[in-house]
Design a protein with these regions (language model features):
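Class I Rossmann-like S-adenosyl-L-methionine
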Residues: 1-205
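Short, glycine-/Ser/Thr-/acidic-enriched flexible segments
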Residues: 202, 221-222
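Conserved class I S-adenosyl-L-methionine
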Residues: 233-240
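Glycine-rich SAM-binding Motif I of class I
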Residues: 244
């Protein structure tokens, strides 16, 4: 779906926000997995540079992660609801100075006002960014404090964990390899073959990835494979649900 207004000219961030708004209209239908829609949109808009793509994608995902809080805050203000959600999401991946320069004065005034809201005063279910029903079930199982902590973890962008393929390399060797590359890494706390990378480095472009020496796998899944204790001739299938 496309919004009626034309793409703004000039300011790159303003164009990113326009693209994020177009994309969000489709994503909020929730009839296709969000990551697929984002990937398709970025493929169709090759004029967007790497930084632009990052802003568009992260703005949309920020809205999805914090949709209930953002929707609460976006009850006020002018323009469309999707526009207000995009402005809130953009604050998660842009600077205030850059955002202020890219949007209208009244939009910045609104952003500044809602930013003063203490979200800790909102109802617990709203703060969790979950439905009332789901939050009630978590609260019944774990108590409100732990339910909120779990919800916060679920709504936080996952770190990038990799698993070393011991047939082709070792964790020590991979650590040395990353010492020569622009990667900030740390040993996974529990998984014996895991490393955790900070940020979202372009692993696909590295020789160590294309050679099969490492694979992307979260630490929890790595631990499950060890707990299963697969023997020679057995296989563990790790089905990834992704954003679906």
């Amino acid at each position: 779906m496309r919004i009626e207004a034309a793409s703004p000219q000039g300011d790159r961030l303003a164009q990113c926000l326009w693209n994020a708004q177009c994309l969000l209209l489709d994503v909020l239908k929730f009839d296709v997995a969000a990551d697929k829609l984002v990937s398709r949109y970025l493929r169709e808009h090759r004029e967007l540079g790497p930084r632009d793509r990052h802003v568009v994608a992260e703005t949309v995902f920020a809205v999805l992660r914090q949709k209930r809080v953002f929707s609460h805050l976006a009850q006020s203000g002018g323009g469309t609801l999707e526009r207000r959600l995009v402005l809130l999401g953009a604050r998660c991946c842009t600077t205030d100075a850059g955002l202020q320069a890219a949007i209208a004065e009244d939009e910045w005034t609104w952003i500044s006002q809602v930013s003063t809201v203490d979200t800790r005063t909102l109802p617990a279910a709203v703060r969790s960014n979950l439905t009332d029903e789901w939050f009630a079930q978590l609260t019944e199982a774990y108590g409100e404090t732990d339910a909120l902590a779990l919800a916060e973890a679920l709504n936080t962008a996952a770190p990038l964990d990799i698993r070393i393929n011991t047939i082709k390399s070792s964790r020590a060797a991979v650590r040395v390899e990353f010492n020569t590359a622009p990667f900030d890494r740390a040993t996974c706390a529990l998984a014996p073959l895991g490393l955790r990378l900070k940020g979202k480095p372009a692993l696909q472009k590295t020789d160590i990835f294309t050679s099969g020496a490492i694979e992307v796998q979260d630490e929890g899944s790595q631990l499950l494979t060890h707990l299963l204790g697969a023997k020679r001739g057995e296989m563990v299938a790790d089905f990834c649900a992704g954003a679906g």
